[in-house]
Swiss-Prot record:
Alphabetical list of Pfam families matching this protein: SPOUT_MTase
Quaternary context: Homodimer.
Similarity remark: Belongs to the RNA methyltransferase RlmH family.
HAMAP family, A to Z: 23SrRNA_methyltr_H
Organism field: Heliobacterium modesticaldum (strain ATCC 51547 / Ice1)
Compartments where found: Cytoplasm
Key words of the record: Cytoplasm, Methyltransferase, rRNA processing, S-adenosyl-L-methionine, Transferase
Claim: Ligase is one of the keywords in the record: no
Catalysed reactions listed for this entry: pseudouridine(1915) in 23S rRNA + S-adenosyl-L-methionine = N(3)-methylpseudouridine(1915) in 23S rRNA + S-adenosyl-L-homocysteine + H(+)
The protein's name: Ribosomal RNA large subunit methyltransferase H
Length: 161
């Protein structure tokens, strides 16, 4: 069984997102071992300088990496500049990760300014969910839905489209 750890910046606040996450966590229980770890975000000024932005991303990145824990994992950075994957691509990657290991996959979700270069450096893949921009809190729900869909594909089960 694949072990999935989602490490995200910021605390989920919206009730509708929390409810959606609970639903997919429940559904995924039959397919994988799942952990979601939230790390504190930094206060971002309205117009941060490049230096301020880099420092904020570095602090948040250090927290993400500490929360990721075990070094023996496949890191996946969720990044709008990453590679676009279809559902079938994700299902195939999940199948290979489970078969060939390491059996832990860590998905990194950055804060408002994105992920630090240090987080990107430990990631074997950079995945863009869409060319659209989503709030980083909504990305958690989209990610869980896609992981659930990938699990269903890998088991040959139907999923409403």
């Amino acid at each position: 069984m694949l072990h999935i750890r989602i490490v995200a910046v910021g605390k989920l606040k919206e009730k509708y997102l929390k409810e959606g996450l609970r639903e997919y966590i429940k559904r995924l229980g039959a397919y994988s071992r799942l952990e979601i770890i939230e790390v504190p975000d930094e206060k971002v000024p309205d117009k941060p300088s490049d230096t301020e932005a880099a420092l904020i991303k570095r602090k948040e990145g250090d927290r993400l990496l500490a929360a990721a824990g075990d070094k023996d994992y496949i890191g996946v950075a969720l990044d709008p500049r990453g590679e676009m994957w279809s559902t079938e691509d994700l299902a195939d990657k999940m199948r290979r990760w489970e078969l060939y290991g390491p059996n832990l996959v860590v998905f990194f979700i950055g804060g408002t300014l994105g992920l630090s270069k240090e987080v990107h450096a430990v990631c074997k893949a950079k995945w863009s969910l869409s060319r659209l921009t989503f709030p980083h809190q909504l990305v958690r729900l989209i990610l869980l839905e896609q992981v659930y869909r990938g699990c269903k594909v890998n088991r040959g089960e139907t999923y409403h489209r």
